[in-house]
Amino acid sequence: MSKINKLEHIRNIGICAHIDAGKTTTTERILYYTGKSHKIGEVHEGGATMDWMEQEQERGITITSAATTCRWQDKIINIIDTPGHVDFTIEVERSLRVLDGAVAVFDGVAGVEPQSETVWRQADKYNVPRMCFVNKMDRMGADFYRCVEMLKDRLGAKPLVIQLPVGIEENFKGIIDLIKMKAVIWKDEALGAEYFEEDIPADMKDKAEEYRAKLLDMVVELDDHVMEKYLSGEEVTAEEIKRLIRKGTISAAFYPVLCGSAFKNKGVQPLLDAVVDFLPSPIDIGIVKGMEVSTGEEKDFPISVTEPFAALAFKIMNDPFVGSLTFIRIYSGKITSGTTVINTVKNKREKIGRMLLMHANNREDVKEASAGDIVALAGLKDTTTGDTLSDIDQQVILERMEFPEPVIELAVEPKSTADQEKMGLALSRLAAEDPSFRVSTDYETGQTVIKGMGELHLEIIIDRMRREFKVEANIGAPQVAYRETITKVCEIDYTHKKQSGGAGQFARVKIIFEPLKEVKDLKDEDKNKIFVFESKIIGGAVPKEYIPGVEKGLNNIRETGVIAGYPMIDFKATLVDGAFHDVDSSVLAFEIAAKAAFREGMPKGNPKLLEPIMQVEVITPDEYMGDIIGDLNSRRGQIQSMDPRGNAQVVTANVPLAEMFGYVNTLRSLSQGRAQFSMIFSHYDQVPSQVADIIKAKK
């Protein structure tokens, strides 16, 4: 197969969903039926191939996205298995950035759950075409049609039903294919490898006709010629329907909905057919956004084998056998072992050593990879998540990923002097792997503080520190990661002068600080940022080479705010004027001036303390509703909605994270263990003044 042809045959897909919807099981079945796995791994036995970290096998959840390659028909499918637990949404975000399409797996009993909504929003952000697989159709209480309604109501999605279930709960035995208008039934004794087509059961004929008509109504809208044919009563062929479903899926006009039971081995092969038939190849995506280093211009780069090499590093992983592995998605050109490329974000050269195709935790050495491939590189020195690797002669920086701010922090102390050094190494390695995990030192206490997206996230980091790096540490109680911001515009003109013997230092900066939400002409790419810097220097008042010093100074100093030393977020700094000295000015002098300007200027911006607000969803039997709502209100919660779901009630509320520690035990006692809850970070909001005073006093 020629390289150019090969691009059409690649599908880079992610499998993502809520925890326990059956993503890993679905992936396991895909590997089994595509011949990559000779024994089916069961998650609840701790044997799943994709869940290869010890912590994942023990907990039965997927933490890191393992990438694997398999073949179906004559296509190459690169699958990224993503975690569904809210503490690991960053993994999902990174995966979606480099995928061309996704399969969203839903639990046939629970339908669209909170984490499903988060993943769906993330996929919207990156415009990832996707289809839906309603799983667990064999389970008690499974309801395919309710799930389809929830896709509309909760996600605002336009579902295109292309299959219907045959039988429900323990009698679920197959599907109706609405494109071919045939029933597909699986034989239980053959582990789902054998299935056959038959006529649609008589009692389902009417329903199948009804959903087939809905399907045709939606797809013919995409093609005038087929629409005329359909309206004049002519038969629309299966090929035409498939072509239009593909067109609509790629343009996100709708989302095909399939069903099955991965655990019971039913519905997986048609899902694979649909991945190949409907999800895009790299050619369908066509372009990737980036910046040309030589000109600084933003432009669209074609995805092609014949273009210069460009790839995005989207994950770092420590492998016990190979050491540090950097997963890259190649967007254009090709690469061979032994080549030298450049990391354009860090401006450092990297030599490509071993190149591996990954199958969960098995690996295959390859000598060459090209556009569309996802490979792991061993031994890169300076590359971290979100960096671009590029051809040395034609350098580009691909669009970077934005990572959320951590919401929870813990103090960690090594148990012995021997652990001290090992802990530093372990934490820096783990932080390189995971951009949503941060490590810092508290200047006042000298303690090492680790920050992450939730209690489970930090628990697993500490667990990995013990197991992989053999570090024993004492762990403090979890603390809320507060932030600070300004609420009004302020301007500061600051001059830094030092002329006492030897080389002097001189830098003058005039900076306007303003709250992000008050910036009128904020660029689209800056809307999700927590700090925006812009230079409006005209006529060389501050030479170009010194301006990065101003940005660096502000970026460093904003980590310790002016109220209680928490990082400052959601503001814009604009450098409007300044002055320099031919001899005494330097990048460092401007960095120092910017830091001092921040310290002096920020108190004038009416700074306020911010706290993380969580979206909490509680599912409870009716009789405990009153107590649960009363308790949420007492935690400074704001009830957003109350909806019935089956025979239970679903309460959604926004509650400060500071009030949610230990909530699991309270909920258990309020509902005699019958209610359950989940929470996702929603946004930062101002802390009420009486609470802010207590926080400041503690600092």
From Swiss-Prot:
It is found in: Cytoplasm. Residues 8-283 form the tr-type G domain. GO terms for molecular function: GTP binding; GTPase activity; translation elongation factor activity. GO terms for biological process: ribosome disassembly. Its main location: cytoplasm. InterPro entries: EF-G-like_DII, EFG_II, EFG_III, EFG_III/V, EFG_IV, EFG_V, EFG_V-like, G_TR_CS. It holds the Pfam family EFG_IV. Catalyzes the GTP-dependent ribosomal translocation step during translation elongation. During this step, the ribosome changes from the pre-translocational (PRE) to the post-translocational (POST) state as the newly formed A-site-bound peptidyl-tRNA and P-site-bound deacylated tRNA move to the P and E sites, respectively. Catalyzes the coordinated movement of the two tRNA molecules, the mRNA and conformational changes in the ribosome. PANTHER family: RIBOSOME-RELEASING FACTOR 2, MITOCHONDRIAL, TRANSLATION ELONGATION FACTOR G-RELATED. This is Elongation factor G. It comes from Rickettsia conorii (strain ATCC VR-613 / Malish 7).
